[in-house]
Amino acid sequence: GMALCSFPVMAQQSPNFLIIQCDHLTQRVVGAYGADPSCTPPIDRIASQGVTFANAYVGCPLSQPSRAALWSGLMPHQTNVRSNSAEHINPPLPDSIPTLGSLFTANGYEAVHFGKTHDMGSLRGFRHKEPVAKPFTDPEFPVNNDSFLDVGTCEDAVAYLSNPPQEPFICIADFQNPHNICGYVGENKGEHIDSPISTPLPLLPENFEVENWEKLPLPIQYICCSHRRMMQAAHWNEDNYRHYVAAFQH
């Protein structure tokens, strides 16, 4: 998920840009796209004051290929970043391919990036600051180091925007969450009883029960039957899945 804000400054012709990137965010929980109840009031406020994209797709349903496509404007078969593998299998983006950061920098912008990278070189041109983990606890849901890093990312971005440079800038605040829902599955693998939470459990989607697996696309069959996270959830009941959805939405 991504939100783009433009902050025009009267003293300069070039506007400033803030890009907020949320890993694994689905529009099905975003109020601006009709989710009821909405899990994203701040995003909804931004959307109400600007433009929303109603028909947008990622370049690939994997982190590194998708991010390389986003920051370069090219599809994975053009960037050659095709998986989440290490560099000896998955080469980084060639220097010959322009990136969003290199184009903005070449045109007089300060390009800064805070937070998650996982970009295979596609953030070239941005000055990156690694976030510092800020531990916290949640009384109802497990949290880990990736979530702690998001606190540091937010604080770094706010500090930068509170004291912006004189030249025009493009700033990216790149968050780990809600991708950490993958870790929730591992924390609750197998048969288990979930602890009660303070809010009502959400209902499961209408397509939760699959009547005919053979009618589903092969990639979906693979994810549902072979992926390690689905193996960890193989013995979950419907109540476990409702807690899982609640964890994602919170």
Task: Tell me the role of every PLM-derived stretch.
Residues A35-T40, Y57-L62, E87-I97, P202, ...:
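A short beta-strand-to-alpha-helix junction
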